[in-house]
Curated annotation (Swiss-Prot):
Organism from which the protein derives: Carpobrotus chilensis (Sea fig)
Listed name of the protein: Photosystem I assembly protein Ycf4
Keywords from the UniProt entry: Chloroplast, Membrane, Photosynthesis, Plastid, Thylakoid, Transmembrane, Transmembrane helix
Lineage: Eukaryota, Viridiplantae, Streptophyta, Embryophyta, Tracheophyta
GO cellular component, as recorded: chloroplast thylakoid membrane; photosystem I
Membrane topology: Multi-pass membrane protein
Record-annotated membrane-spanning stretches: 21-43, 58-80
Length: 184
């Protein structure tokens, strides 16, 4: 969702609460739980998963390996669920021509730097930079080039914007801020 007027442009950024992240976390949790249950079943010599017929899986080496994969998968799944619940990467970009200020806010991981807040003047912006890399791993990213601070990304690398969409967004933002565009 975006909000624009003549002097203020606010763009909300989606964080880690995407449908694909929910799907991956859920699939990974179920798969790793299955691996762990099969490993524990082989250790105990009982069938803990009643949906499947009992299979003879020796604890050494198959049961140990499956238990290890199950535990590792549960750790990765819990990491994904934590990033989803904390909504890491979400935030907003606010461009205020009236005040002459640009504010970029993102949520991070819990701790000292949970809130990432950047504020700078519009007159310090050199240009809007578009980075286009085509090939197997396409990369289309929009940056703000700031004097003394380098380039700050405005779009995520996994947004999968088409070249037309990224150019349109860059042109609208450059027109709104009255700054030039650079293409790399």
């Amino acid at each position: 969702m975006n909000w624009r007027s003549k002097r203020i442009w606010i763009e909300l950024i989606t964080g880690s609460r995407k449908i694909s992240n929910f799907c991956w976390a859920f699939i990974l949790f179920l798969g790793s739980l299955g691996f762990l249950l099969v490993g524990i079943s082989s250790y105990l010599g009982r069938n803990l998963i009643s949906l499947f017929p009992p299979q003879q899986i020796l604890f050494f080496p198959q049961g140990i390996v499956m238990s290890f994969y199950g535990i590792a998968g549960l750790f990765i799944s819990s990491y994904l669920w934590c990033t989803i619940s904390w909504n890491v990467g979400s935030g907003y970009d606010r461009f205020d021509r009236k005040e002459g200020i640009v504010c970029i806010f993102r949520w991070g991981f819990p701790g000292k730097n949970r809130r990432i807040f950047l504020r700078f003047l519009i007159k310090d912006i050199q240009s809007i930079r578009i980075e286009l890399k085509e090939g197997i791993y396409t990369r289309r990213v929009l940056y703000l080039e700031i004097r003394g601070q380098g380039a700050i990304p405005l779009t995520r690398t996994d947004d999968n914007l088409t070249p037309r969409e990224i150019e349109q967004k860059a042109a609208e933002l450059a027109y709104f801020l009255r700054i030039p565009i650079e293409v790399f």
